[in-house]
Structures are given as structure tokens and as C-alpha cells.
């Protein structure tokens, strides 16, 4: 049994539920013959990967859906061996080079070299190039991005790249200038409500419009999250009711409790407890950027107007440090410690003002 988010994922550009004008433009791009490198970007849950797979289906036909998982071992110049998992068909290869950490440059060079030098076995597709899909390009090191730029030029005749990321701000200009940028905006609340209603109708379920809207708003316009929450509601209670509780993910509840612990007490002992909770989130593969963003959102609820600006500025500083560093826990803990000091001083100053 597959999840709704996979079961009802559109497989062609013609069947996409929203951004249909963009889908028509992508279809024209595929049919024109001169297919460029693509840089597909947009927020999480907007449908980037779905559109990329639809493009591949338009390029090569149904063969791209015959996927296999491959494990490759790449040896770095320092003789270090790196295990990389890829998803491949006869026509394309999908890889996340940032999984290799600081060795991502070697992974990119080896992967692209291997794909570009292999010939197509099936000529029925009438495409003389293969496609390499690189995900989370914005997390690549600068060395890897420069290596990617050189490799793009070298193997242009036999290989096309589709780069996928959340934001182009961390992608170097030479790569951006060599790709056709395709922005996939987050779906509107109405779009998400429409998709939820359609999926529930196909499942034979009656979804109240009020609940559909609550799901769409709670998902922050993330369609994948909305579908997962809707399916969780179905497991929790059916028939649906307009005011039924929408289940939250465990890590979101845990993060809210962590924020409440920070606000309730500002001591070294509490900081040590919070550090342990942050470690717990990181070991469960919650990205540090998501932790920082969620923590900031929860903490701002307990700040007044004057303090909000300082806390937001402080979070931006430590988020930047987070991107530059390699140990996320240091920067998350530093943000919490700085917030504790700022919040404690703010509360003490407020009490003094009330007394006098």
C-alpha cells in the first residue's frame, strides 16, 4: 500500500493540477529539440521533483519509470572511499552529491564522467543525450559548484543536467547563467484544497471544505505535507468532521516544547537540557536549517515588538554561521544561549520598570 502522495503523483505534464501555463511551456521546451540544462527551484512541497519526472517522461517515454537503486563506491585522491546511492533508469541518473559532504566535488566529476561517456542502448527515444538530475544543489560546496560548471561545458554534447534546489541564492552565478531557470512557486491555498478534494474523491471519501482549507493553511502551502496530514486524519478519524484535530508531526511538537523550555527558564542547567533536545532532533535527521527556522517561529510568539527585531536579526546571523560551519549543534546552541541572555535581560529590565 503506497501513500497518497506517491499514489496520486501526476506522471505527465498534461496531468499536473496547478501551474498549467508553466507545464505547457515546459512541454514546448521538450518538443523544440534543443533541450538546455535546467535549474529548477522553489519552496519545499511545491512540486519541483514531480515536474522534473514529468519532463523526463516527455523526453524519453515510459522507460524513465523503470527505476533501479544503485550503490557506487568512489575513491577520492586521498584514497578515501565514499558510498553513494543513486536512482537510475536507462535514460537518467539521480544523485544527491551533498550526501558526500566535503567530497562532493569528486562525486560530481566521477558521476558525470561515467554517464557522459556511456552510450544509449535504446535509440528509439531519439535523444542522443542522457540526463543527470542533481538534487539539493544549493548545499554543494563552492569547489563542487565550480567543478560542476567545468563539467557542464565539457560533456554538453552527451549529457544534460537538471539541477534542483530550494533557493538559487547559494548557487554560483556561472552555473545560473548556463542553465534555464524554472521557478516552481508554492501552490495557492485554493490549489491545495482542490488537490485534497480530488484525492479524497478518488479514495471514496467525503472531505469537508472547511477541513480542506484548515489542512492547506496548516501545511504552509506545502502540498506534500498537506496530503500526508490529510491521510493521517483519515487514519485517526473517519468520517471527517469540520473541526477535527489535525495531527502534527512528533518533531514539531518536540520543537515547540523545546522553545517553551527556553522561555520558561534561562539557566546553564536549562541550556544543557536544550542542547540534549537539539541533539535528539539532529540525530533523527531533522535538518538544522529547519530546526533554526522552527525554533525562531516558536520563540517569536513570546517576544514583544521591540525584542522580535533583535531576535530575528540574531537568528539570521547564526543561520549564516550555520551555513559556513560543519557542526550544526554549535551554532544552534549559540543561538539559544544568546536568546536566553537577551530574553532574561529584557524580563529583568521590565520588572525594574514596573517596580519604579
UniProtKB/Swiss-Prot annotation:
* A Pfam family per the record: RCF1-5-like_lid
A single GO cellular-component term from the record reads: DNA replication factor C complex
Listed name of the protein? Replication factor C subunit 3
Subcellular location(s): the record lists: Nucleus
Biological processes, Gene Ontology terms? DNA-templated DNA replication; positive regulation of DNA-directed DNA polymerase activity
**The UniProt record lists the keyword Metal-binding:** no
Spell out which residues are annotated as carrying Phosphoserine: 125
Organism classification, top ranks?
Answer: Eukaryota, Metazoa, Chordata, Craniata, Vertebrata
Q: What is its main location?
A: nucleus
Q: Which GO terms describe its molecular function?
A: ATP hydrolysis activity; DNA binding; DNA clamp loader activity; single-stranded DNA helicase activity
What family is this?
A: Belongs to the activator 1 small subunits family.
Keywords for this protein: Acetylation, DNA replication, DNA-binding, Nucleus, Phosphoprotein
Assembly information from the UniProt record = Subunit of the RFC complex, an heteropentameric complex consisting of a large subunit RFC1 and four small subunits RFC2, RFC3, RFC4 and RFC5; the RFC complex interacts with PCNA. Forms an heterotetrameric complex with RFC2, RFC4 and RFC5; this complex has ATPase activity but is not stimulated by PCNA. The heterotetramer of subunits RFC2, RFC3, RFC4 and RFC5 interacts with RAD17. Interacts with CNTD1; this interaction facilitates crossover formation.
Matching entries from InterPro entries are given as: AAA+_ATPase, DNA_pol3_clamp-load_cplx_C, DNA_Rep/Repair_Clamp_Loader, P-loop_NTPase
The residue stretches assigned to a coiled coil in this entry are: none
Question: What is this protein's gene name?
Answer: Rfc3
Q: Which residues carry this modification: N6-acetyllysine?
A: 20
What does it do? Answer: Subunit of the replication factor C (RFC) complex which acts during elongation of primed DNA templates by DNA polymerases delta and epsilon, and is necessary for ATP-dependent loading of proliferating cell nuclear antigen (PCNA) onto primed DNA.
Amino acid at each position: 500500500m503506497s501513500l497518497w502522495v506517491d499514489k496520486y503523483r501526476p506522471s505527465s505534464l498534461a496531468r499536473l493540477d496547478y501551474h498549467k501555463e508553466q507545464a505547457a511551456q515546459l512541454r514546448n521546451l521538450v518538443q523544440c529539440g534543443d533541450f538546455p540544462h535546467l535549474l529548477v527551484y522553489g519552496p519545499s512541497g511545491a512540486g519541483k521533483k514531480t515536474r522534473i519526472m514529468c519532463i523526463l517522461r516527455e523526453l524519453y517515454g515510459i522507460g524513465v519509470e523503470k527505476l533501479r537503486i544503485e550503490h557506487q563506491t568512489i575513491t577520492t585522491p586521498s584514497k578515501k572511499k565514499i558510498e553513494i546511492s543513486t536512482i537510475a533508469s536507462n535514460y537518467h541518473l539521480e544523485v544527491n552529491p551533498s550526501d558526500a559532504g566535503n567530497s562532493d566535488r569528486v562525486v560530481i566529476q566521477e558521476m558525470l564522467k561515467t554517464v557522459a561517456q556511456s552510450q544509449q542502448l535504446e535509440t528509439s527515444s531519439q535523444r542522443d543525450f542522457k540526463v543527470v538530475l542533481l538534487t539539493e544543489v544549493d548545499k554543494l560546496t563552492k569547489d563542487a559548484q565550480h567543478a560542476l560548471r567545468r563539467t557542464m561545458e565539457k560533456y554538453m554534447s552527451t549529457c544534460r543536467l537538471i539541477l534542483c534546489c530550494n533557493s538559487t541564492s547559494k548557487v554560483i552565478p556561472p552555473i545560473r547563467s548556463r542553465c534555464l531557470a524554472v521557478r516552481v512557486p508554492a501552490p495557492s491555498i485554493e490549489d491545495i484544497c482542490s488537490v485534497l478534494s480530488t484525492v479524497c474523491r478518488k479514495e471514496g471519501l467525503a472531505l469537508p471544505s472547511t477541513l480542506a482549507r484548515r489542512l492547506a493553511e496548516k501545511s504552509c502551502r506545502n502540498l506534500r505535507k498537506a496530503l500526508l496530514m490529510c491521510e493521517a486524519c483519515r487514519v485517526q478519524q473517519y468520517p471527517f468532521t469540520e473541526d477535527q484535530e489535525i495531527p502534527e508531526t512528533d518533531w514539531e511538537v518536540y520543537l515547540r516544547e523545546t522553545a517553551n523550555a527556553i522561555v520558561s527558564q534561562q539557566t546553564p542547567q536549562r541550556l544543557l537540557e536544550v542542547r540534549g533536545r537539539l541533539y535528539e532532533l539532529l540525530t533523527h535527521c531533522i535538518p538544522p536549517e529547519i530546526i533554526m527556522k522552527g525554533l525562531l517561529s516558536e520563540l517569536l510568539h513570546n517576544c514583544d515588538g521591540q525584542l522580535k527585531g533583535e531576535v530575528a536579526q540574531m537568528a539570521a546571523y547564526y543561520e549564516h554561521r550555520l551555513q559556513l560551519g560543519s557542526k550544526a549543534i554549535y551554532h544552534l546552541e549559540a543561538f539559544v544561549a544568546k536568546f536566553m541572555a537577551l530574553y532574561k535581560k529584557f524580563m529583568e529590565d521590565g520588572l525594574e520598570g514596573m517596580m519604579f
